[in-house]
């Protein structure tokens, strides 16, 4: 989880990713941020986030992003 938060902080400094639960809904992360995030997550965790995974529910909080990464690592 800590690595996910570090990546998020690199992309969008100044956001409290430990408590924020509406990163997409409140437009804290925009589409460019998501593309950057996906690339960094794919590289850092050696996973492949597919277009099917690119739904707001998977990216609304650091916890949801971590759950996505964990699920993809197990596949």
Annotate the PLM regions.
Residues 35:
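Conserved catalytic core of two-component sensor histidine kinases
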Residues 38:
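Internal alpha/beta domain cores that form substrate/cofactor-binding pockets in large enzymes
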Residues 31:
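Conserved G/P- and acidic residue-centered "switch" motifs that form tight phosphate/ATP-binding loops
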Residues 53-64:
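AMP-binding/adenylate-forming catalytic domain of the ANL superfamily
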Residues 1-16, 67-75:
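Thiotemplate assembly-line natural product biosynthesis machinery
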Residues 9-28, 47-55:
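Phosphopantetheine carrier-protein modules
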